[in-house]
Structure formats: C-alpha cells, structure tokens
Amino acid sequence: MRSDVIKKGIERAPHRSLFKAMGFTDEELERPLIGVANSFNELIPGHIHLRKIAEAVKAGIRMAGGTPLEFNTIGICDGIAMNHLGMKYSLPSRELIADSVELVARVYHFDGIVVIASCDKIIPGMLMAIARLNIPAIFVSGGPMLPGRFKGEYVDVKTVFEAVGAVKAGKMSYEELKLLENFACPGCGSCAGMFTANTMNALTEALGISLPWNGTAPAPYAHRIRIAKETGMQIVKLVEKDVKARDILTREAFEDAIAVDMALGGSTNTVLHLMAIANEAKVDLSLEDFDRISEKTPTLAKLSPAGKHFVVDLYEAGGILGVMKRLSELGLIHEDRLTVSLKTVGELLKSAFVSRDDVIRPVTNPYHPRGGIMILRGTLAPNGAVIKVSAVEGVEVFEGPAKVFDSEEEATAAILSGKIERGDVVVIRYEGPKGGPGMREMLTPTSAIAGMGLDKDVALVTDGRFSGATRGLSVGHVSPEAAEGGPIALVKDGDIIRIDLKNKRIDLLVDEEELRKRREEWKPKVKELTGYLKRYSTLVTSANTGAILRH
C-alpha cells in the first residue's frame, strides 16, 4: 500500500506512536488509509452541512475495511463575495485549495482520497488536486439547495440579485425586497439553479469521477447521505483495484462533460475550470474543443437562470444520466469509458431514465440545436471570448456604442444611477485574471441590467467573468485581457461594438490606423497589490487557457 511509507517497518515506530496518540489502533493502521478532504465551514450555505456528509463517507470507508483520515481546506461563497474586494480572491482560491489538498495527500501517502465540496471554486480546486495526485479518488458533494417560494412563485438567489435592480427602477419596494431575502434561500446546499456550483457538480458525474446521482440529489434528501456512504465504500474498492484518477479523467471523459455542459446550458465558468482540471490530468483541452462539441450538441434543458426549472426538477426528471442517455442517442457520449462506479458509462446508461420531457427535452425537440455556450472571436477578442447563449433570448446580432468602465464598481454605479441606455454596450475591463486581479464575476451589474428590464436591450462585455446566475447578452473572458494590452484596453466611449452570434464574432468597429495610434499611447494600469493577489497576478495565465498558474 502507498501508506506503508508512513506506517510499516521498525523505522516507522515513531510515526505509529503519533497515530496512536490520536487513538488509532494497530488494526486500523493495517488497513488502507483513505484521506477525506472536507471543505466544511460556517461561511457557505453549500458547505454548512458537510460535516454530516463527511461522517457518512467515513462510515462507508470503515464498512468497507478502510481507515478514514479527515482534514479540511478552505472555501469561499461567491454570492457573499460578489461586488466587492472579496471577489478578487474567489478564483485565486481554486489554486490554493488544489495545493492544500496536494500537500496533505503527499505527506500522508494516502492509499486513496475522497474530496467533499459543493460550491463554485472549491469543486474545481478539489478536482485539480486529485488529477494532480493521480491516486484512487472520488468526489462527493453536499447537493443543491431547494428553491424558495415567495408570493406563490419559486425563487432563488438570482431572484434577489435581480430584485435589487427592480427596486432601483421603482418596480419593487424595499420592504418587498427585505421579505424576499427571507424566502429565496430556504436552507443548506449549493444555490438552487444551474449556476456554477451545480454545473460543476453535474460535470463531476458526467466525468465519471463521482457516483451516479451525485450531480443532482438535493442537499436535504436522505439520498445524499446514501451517496456519501456508498462513496466511502467505493473508494476502498478503487484502492484494491488501483484505479487512479487519471484512469477516469481521460480525454473522452472531458468531451462527455462538455457535451453535458452544453446540453444543460451550464455556467461559462466551466470553460475555465474544465481546462484547468484537464491541464492537471495531462489532457490537452482548448476553446476549440468547447466550440466543436457545442456545435453538435443540442440544448436539452433550461434551468434557472435561463428558465423556470431548478436542479431538483432535473433530479426528478432523471438526473445527469438522463441527460447523457438522451445525448447517447446522437452518439455524443463515449459509452465504453470507465467511471468510479467501476462500471462503464454504457452500463450505467442501461438503468438511466427520463421521466419529464419538459425538463430534459428529447433530442428531436431541443430548446436549441446547438449547445448553451458559444466561443466568440474577432477584433475585440482575438484569443476568444465566451457567452452563455442559452441565457440569451431573441438576439442574434447586437451593435451599439460602448460605455467604458475600468472596474465593476464604476459600471454598477452607472447602471443603478440610470446612465445606461437601451442599445448601449457596457464594457468592463481591467477585471481579468491578471488585471483584476482575480477575474471577478459581474453578477451585480448583469443582475441590475436584468432587474431594470434592460437585459434584451443592453449588452455587457468584459475581460472578467460571470456568475452562473447571469442571464442576458453578456460576453466574458475577453482575451487578451486589458492588463496584457488586449484590444479591449483600447476601447473608448462611443466606439461601436458588434456582437454577431450567427457568425460567432465580436468586433470593435474602429479602423486599424486609429487603433494603432491608441496602442502607441496606451499605458497599462498599475495597481498596488500585496499578499496573495500580488503573487497570483504575476503567475496567472489568460482566461483562454483556464487562468491556471505558470509553473
């Protein structure tokens, strides 16, 4: 066993003595040592209940003859971090989480590991770690939150974000907003829609690195505890057969995950995260792969923020395997690849079902013939940009004058004070991975635009990124970013920007000679940075490569 390095032989008597100081018996030390990386904290609704999940995982490990060793890592709630300095630290936390899990796992030579997380950057951080470690590993989440009910309607945190704009526009009273706060998020779990957290949870199941139903079983349901126990039991089987993370995280697995992502109309953040995880798994994944798979994958679901359904509806309709079953009809799923269940995808699909065609549409009646995420290129984004087309309605071409802001705060203030008009293209720059630094999510400005009823008439373009809760004509991940001298740094108020979804282009309609003059005059904005952000900004790469760190 890998763990023999720290527990076998006469030289390891001191090591065993230290284990015994924690109450471990000789018999426990003879068994496989299974790391349990928990991200429980009292800071995130999706993580507040993870102690219970970890206890179930550990029970399963013991039942199967292993010895669990639990440790913790950090986690940040993107919703609470939104629209202030805190959001600069969200994406950078992904790398810290991966590094912290790697550090502990390397020191203790775990025979296998179970990683537990529910929310935005913690999930990819955990997956990056297990891909890097390449030992037997399974991911398990705490599950999605249930939607709330307010005045007879289902609501979620997106409803509250958009209500802020509605209050500013005089469409809702502040007293009604205060009431809504109490009902939108009814309990534990990752926010109820197909936002970043739940998209990533869904993709762990599509990748095959979690057990069936992990992607959708709601946080309050007993099914979630059963999945956690089964995960604990299954990791011991993976150790016995020495099935490692990269045996699961193959190129075919990533292609299937992208197909599921496109069918669900998932968060644009998945583009960053899947590329970062693939990088650790030694799989070459690029924006071209997302574009290629999106072109042939129909959008089969419209969950919040794009539609009226929530993740609990997807669970009841057949879950992620139900989506994969539908996609397999088009030959879009690699059915012969292995999953952590030790069954192939094809074997799992034999028991898959779809019980609600209104939630998971048939491939003959999709919401859209192509996938929910589109890669744009053009003179404004030579290296690519990303848009969630599943959250855009009735717009194929949008052309308008730019209103340029060098920070999210400036843009939000302008939107809420009524300075943005129908037909405008709001440009928010110097918010990229390096320039932010940290590539903040622009949920507050996009929600304000939507809440004021302008989401079909105003576009937003940024080198930052978006929450999975964002809807409307929102183009993010513009690359190269402003801090690296990308064309977005040269945009001026009044410049015409054209977004053409039919031809997958985003162009700055300014002649080359004028841009050449502007480039000669351009000077990068210098921000005074300290601590982790200073180190991060010097090491982080572009959004079009997953915003990973240079090694």
UniProtKB/Swiss-Prot annotation:
One of its GO terms (cellular component) is cytosol. The active site is at 467 (proton acceptor). Its cofactor is [2Fe-2S] cluster; Mg(2+). Pfam families: ILV_EDD_C (PF24877), ILVD_EDD_N (PF00920). The modification N6-carboxylysine is found at residue 121. SUPFAM superfamilies: IlvD/EDD N-terminal domain-like (SSF143975), LeuD/IlvD-like (SSF52016). Pathway: Amino-acid biosynthesis; L-isoleucine biosynthesis; L-isoleucine from 2-oxobutanoate: step 3/4; Amino-acid biosynthesis; L-valine biosynthesis; L-valine from pyruvate: step 3/4. Binds 1 [2Fe-2S] cluster per subunit. This cluster acts as a Lewis acid cofactor. Belongs to the IlvD/Edd family. Functions in the biosynthesis of branched-chain amino acids. Catalyzes the dehydration of (2R,3R)-2,3-dihydroxy-3-methylpentanoate (2,3-dihydroxy-3-methylvalerate) into 2-oxo-3-methylpentanoate (2-oxo-3-methylvalerate) and of (2R)-2,3-dihydroxy-3-methylbutanoate (2,3-dihydroxyisovalerate) into 2-oxo-3-methylbutanoate (2-oxoisovalerate), the penultimate precursor to L-isoleucine and L-valine, respectively. This is Dihydroxy-acid dehydratase. It comes from Pyrococcus furiosus (strain ATCC 43587 / DSM 3638 / JCM 8422 / Vc1).
